[in-house]
Every structure is written in C-alpha cells, then in structure tokens.
Amino acid sequence: MLSRKGIIPEEYVLTRLAEDPTEPRYRTRERRARFVSKKGNCNVAHKNIREQGRFLQDVFTTLVDLKWPHTLLIFTMSFLCSWLLFAMVWWLIAFAHGDLAPGEGTNVPCVTSIHSFSSAFLFSIEVQVTIGFGGRMVTEECPLAILILIVQNIVGLMINAIMLGCIFMKTAQAHRRAETLIFSKHAVITLRHGRLCFMLRVGDLRKSMIISATIHMQVVRKTTSPEGEVVPLHQVDIPMENGVGGNSIFLVAPLIIYHVIDSNSPLYDLAPSDLHHHQDLEIIVILEGVVETTGITTQARTSYLADEILWGQRFVPIVAEEDGRYSVDYSKFGNTVKVPTPLCTARQLDEDRSLLDALTLASSRGPLRKRSVAVAKAKPKFSISPDSLS
C-alpha cells in the first residue's frame, strides 16, 4: 500500500491508460506507417538485394540472426552431411584395401569390423561424437586412415564450437534484456517552468541496473527540400532532459524524460490540432546502456505517432516513500492527469507571453480550487465526544 503522498483524486485520473475520453476509441482514418514499432522493431522490408553473397562472408552473424528453427535445421544437416561424407571416405578406404571382400582375410584391415556402408556410417558417428563403443578401431595398416581420423575430429570440433557459440549468442542477445525496459504508451505535451515540453516516462522492471544508460530522441517526418527533393524519412536529433541535464540517466526508478520545445526544436510549430491531422510525424526514443550482470550492450526502442501524443496532460506520480524506502506503483505507469496548458504552438507562446499569464489566472479560478474550498468547509460525518475518551 502506498502512502498518502502518492494519492491523487480519482476524478482527475483517466480511467483508460493515457487515453483522452473525449476522442473516439476507434479511428476510421488510416494511420501513418510506423518506422519503429512500439516494441522497438524496425518496420523496414529489404527487397531486390542483388549481392546476397555478402551474407555468407559473415556466416556466424548470419546464423545468429536466423530464427531458431532455421538455425537448428542447419546444424542438424551439418552433422548428418559430415557423418555421411566421412562414412563414404571410410567405406572407400575399406574397399580399396580389400576389407569388404567376403571370406576370411589374412591381411590386417585398415578399420576393424567394417563390412558395409552401414558399419562405415556407424564408425563415422563414433569417431566424430567420440562415443567409443570399442567394436571398431583404426589400425596401423593404413596411414591414410590415421590422417582421415585426425581430419574428422577437427571438423567435428569446429562444428561443435560454432554451434555452441551460436546458441550462446542467441540466448544472450541484448534485446532479451530490453524486454523489461518499458516506455509509457503515450507521450504528453505540457508546461514545465513556463515552457512547453514533450514528456515521456521510462522504467526498468528488473533490480539489476543498466550501467551508463543514455537516451536519445529523433523526429522522423516527410519533408521537401527547397530544390523539390522529397525526403520520406527525414531524421532530426533533438536533445532530451532528465532533470539533471545531459542524456545520461540513473534508471533505478521510473523517470520522466522531457524535451524543451524551443526555437531549435522541430516541434516548435506543432499545434494541438496537428496531433489529430498530422500524418507525417513520428518521434523515436532510443534507450541504450550496458547490462550489469552480463556486460552486454542493450538497446530499447519505441516510437510515438502524432495521435499518441496527449496535449495538456501530465504523468501522475508513482514513486512514494513508505516505511523508510521508496515504492513504485507500476499500475499507474501510464496514467495521466489533465493540467492547464495553452492551446497554441511554442512559437506563439514565446511571442505572446500574456497567454501564459492568462492561463495562470484562469487556473487559479478553476474548479479545482472551488472543490478544495468546498471540501474544507464540509463537516465531518463522525465526531468523538469527550465522554467517550474518559
């Protein structure tokens, strides 16, 4: 149970997670295609790749990038092909030496107990997997057989090393750690220190920390140059703030990351009406750091489209002090509350600061103050008489 420091009146908290109840839940218009999905996957399809042989120049990375069924199928076929190949070699050695001839031979065979291709295949498996049943063995009669034995052992060790390394890299990939790095479903634009700010919340569900965590943000939109060139995915970096300055964050508890919308911001001319009609705006957020337990660099990504940005709302507090420690209520991670915010662009607010003064005056006379006065004048429903205490 959280302390009273984290309690907010229920009528000022949205019942649906970071969603405007005045807007329809389902939109009929077509949404803009995402460049980065909410889970961090890049929505890009590569087509007509001519030089596909470049993928074979880095076989290990190609195997790691493949899906599990494809990777397991490749290693299974590698073992089967190597066993069959060396089984054919052992059968040819026995055939050339005359070990497959019927009857009792007086000559010492190259490999004992090989009488057919099946026995040669079993011997190939015993050599490469080092089972060592003992029924078949290489003799000193054929130096070529000794050389093939050495080569097959080396090939088997190489396949095992590549398979174990690939499986380890696939199970310890950085995106596994990113599954517990969460972002708020919606972003908000509201006032902070008299300036319009773009805000989002980020948190880490694990107790193991992300070392040297940094956060970056980019605005992706369709633009046209003065020469008439259309750039469908024009990326612009914008600075983020976390309360202490810089992009580095100490992610021991959920943080609200914000960007001050100033004259250098690509959101300087963004108005509330653009959030419902602006189809070419996408804000990508990238959180990167080193996993404390494994030392592997991980990266978590998400994006916000125009209709996923809430104007005039603020994230509710979720960190409260309780019993000498801080507790985090993740059930309110994406909850927002409406706050007075000017319905104009940041440029208009900078040019006319009287809009902010009028907003401050209107908020001081708002229903929130009247409600607090009414609550203060309300009489308690229960009273304790002095006689009951004696």
Curated annotation (Swiss-Prot):
It is found in: Membrane. Keywords: ATP-binding, Disulfide bond, Ion channel, Ion transport, Membrane, Metal-binding, Nucleotide-binding, Phosphoprotein, Potassium, Potassium transport, Transmembrane, Transmembrane helix, Transport, Voltage-gated channel. Phosphorylation by MAPK1 results in changes in channel gating that destabilize the closed states and reduce the ATP sensitivity. InterPro entries: Ig_E-set, IRK_C, K_chnl_inward-rec_Kir, K_chnl_inward-rec_Kir6.2, K_chnl_inward-rec_Kir_cyto, Kir_TM. Residues 90-120, 132-142 are extracellular. One of its GO terms (biological process) is response to estradiol. Belongs to the inward rectifier-type potassium channel (TC 1.A.2.1) family. KCNJ11 subfamily. This is ATP-sensitive inward rectifier potassium channel 11. The gene is Kcnj11.
